Amino acid sequence: LGNAKNMGFEIDVIKYIRHFGVKANYTYTHSEITTSKREYKEGSAEYKTGVTQTRPLVNQAPHTANISLLYKDTEHGWNAQLASSFTGTKLALVSPFKDADQWDKAMFGLDLSAEKQFKNGISIFFKANNLLDAKRKIRSEIVKSDYNIIARLNKRECVQATEM
């Protein structure tokens, strides 16, 4: 393994005007670790050991940003959010060989959620993820949009309908 460094900063701002709000967040992260790798010798089935390479930590994007439009009306039991997010390029899989790591590309996302709480304790929750249908490659699977409607009865039972 090796000695890792991980540092950064985060800014989080939220502002409401009556029932409407905006929430913004930005995170910068710098991470690095130097590890040993193997390197193929040109024209041979053998490989050289003792080679090192510096890389970021796995799943550590240097830039992550979110901005959300919020609606909150506690008197009438409404809560809603339209959230956009950006995640920068990040290391997905570390290879034992030099210059053979796999990376995830930067991605934008847009999600919508809403909840209505009734005075009798029942609430209905709706969530739609990945409204822009951004394609993410995760271990050879393509993840697309999905939608959930959840009804909570007395906060003990949960009925869920999902479309994928």
Residue ranges and their predicted role:
Residues G2-N6, V58-P62, D101-M107, E157-E163:
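Transmembrane beta-barrel outer-membrane domains
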Residues R55-P56, K105, N129-N130:
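Flexible, active-site-adjacent loop/turn segments at secondary-structure boundaries
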Residues S85-V94, E115-M164:
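C-terminal beta-signal and adjacent terminal beta-strands/loops
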Residues W78, D111-S113:
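A broad helix-preferring feature
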